[in-house]
Amino acid sequence: MRLCDRDIEAWLDEGRLSINPRPPVERINGATVDVRLGNKFRTFRGHTAAFIDLSGPKDEVSAALDRVMSDEIVLDEGDAFYLHPGELALAVTFESVTLPPDLVGWLDGRSSLARLGLMVHVTAHRIDPGWSGCIVLEFYNSGKLPLALRPGMLIGALSFEPLSGPAARPYNRRQDAKYRDQQGAVASRIDKD
């Protein structure tokens, strides 16, 4: 059962759930908290690679990712990031979120943005118990026009679901946590699997 607005506020007040900066009451809805777009992005470079062999040797996968992923792009206040039709880009939320070991989070896009062709997550919308950091956004423009995305705009909504008990292996305590304390648009670390 997902937390309702009253419970989200109570968990924030008690410090069991942390969203920094804390959202104003107007952004805490019936069962979600609106989140904003941060200013860090990452894209695919122009490249000539025919494919990336995701099951290949780790050093080859790592080298291929280095060739195709851009450095992190940091926008200044007022600047826009243009996502063209058919393009994938990574970004992060403005807010940093910390979940306790007995709570899982879910990221959903906004219907108003989806109606323009913007997907805010390709498949990974679960936020593991014990997570701490900004939430990665996997943007895809399935529309017909470029979309101007500006830091600070409302970009998605988080909901939270209590677990039957605390996780034995919360994300922040796992030795193999590839994205622990992520603050920027971190590229895929599939080579660390």
Swiss-Prot record:
Region: Disordered, residue numbers: 169-193
PANTHER family reported in the protein's UniProt record: DCTP DEAMINASE (PTHR42680:SF3)
Keywords: Hydrolase, Nucleotide metabolism, Nucleotide-binding
Any one GO molecular function term: dCTP deaminase activity
EC number: 3.5.4.13
Family stated for the protein in its record: Belongs to the dCTP deaminase family.
Pathways involved: Pyrimidine metabolism; dUMP biosynthesis; dUMP from dCTP (dUTP route): step 1/2
Top-level EC class as recorded in UniProt: hydrolase
Source superkingdom: Bacteria
Gene: dcd
GO biological process: dUMP biosynthetic process; dUTP biosynthetic process; nucleobase-containing small molecule interconversion
Subunit note: Homotrimer.
The protein's role, per its UniProt record: Catalyzes the deamination of dCTP to dUTP.
Name the record gives this protein: dCTP deaminase
Keyword Hydrolase: yes
